[in-house]
Amino acid sequence: ADVAVTASRVSVQLPPHPSDVSFGCGMDIGWLENQTCSLLVQNGNSIRYELKAGGNEQYLRTYILGWGMSMLAIQRNEVALHCSAISDDAAAILFCGESGSGKSTLTSAYLARGYHLMADDMSFVSYHNETVMAKAAFPYQKLCRDAALRSGHPLDSLIYIDEAKDKYLVPCHEIFDDTSRPVKAIIILGKAPVSQVWLHKLEGLDAFHACVNNLFLRHLLKEKKYAPATAGQCLKIASKVPVYVILRPLEADTTGEVIETAFAITSKVR
């Protein structure tokens, strides 16, 4: 369904709240207020925003596409997972993990083998008719400077989006899959004090907690991430989709081994 994103005097439309509360997230209304902007999300189809004096427009865009869309997902009985998503024209595979865990590197390895990009940073995931479905996001990939140069696009033609991490927004229209796909696997990436690449399949409550802890809004929601609207969907996802963890050593470069471990998993899952 379409989403209307409009500028409005949101600051005077927010529900009453204590001064130390900066957001609300419910099935009917979601809102956010910070130094950059005020956001009001309603009915699963409307995001209204107000850029505050001195607010950064790039930060505003990030809040709308990240936090605003995540609140919208909840109102649609979906969850927004912090993940990269790729597809093989039949099913989707989701790569979750904190920043720096290797999601972009693993995604690029799959794209090089003919897979299609569905999402770079966030995907709407829902449970319908006994099936977990992932929606495509935007046909762009956030890449660091070296990877952006390797993509073949002149840097001055790209959007520079992250000074702290030196990243660019790179178009991927020719390899983008805009179709909703059933999810066949979730792979969570991370670094840990291990001596070699470590693979483990999560079961039961461990898989459930892993889904909850990879919600896009997890840091904002804190303990509220276990509210029925999000936890219920995560429980269904974890019960239907195999969830794996791949950990790599803190220091050694094990990129190739992580990639091959992931391919070994996804080649077997149907």
Q: What do these predicted ranges mean?
A:
Residues 110:
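Aromatic pocket-lining residues of Rossmann-like dinucleotide-binding sites
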Residues 26-75:
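Charged, amphipathic alpha-helical linker segments immediately N-terminal to NTP-binding catalytic cores
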Residues 72-85:
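Pre-Walker A adenine-sensing motif
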Residues 103:
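Conserved lysine of the Walker
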Residues 84, 88-97, 113-270:
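Glycine-rich, often acidic-flanked micro-motifs
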Residues 1-15:
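Short Lys/Arg-enriched alpha/beta "domain-start" segment
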Residues 100:
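Walker A (P-loop) phosphate-binding loop of P-loop NTPases
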Residues 106-107:
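Post-Walker A alpha-helix
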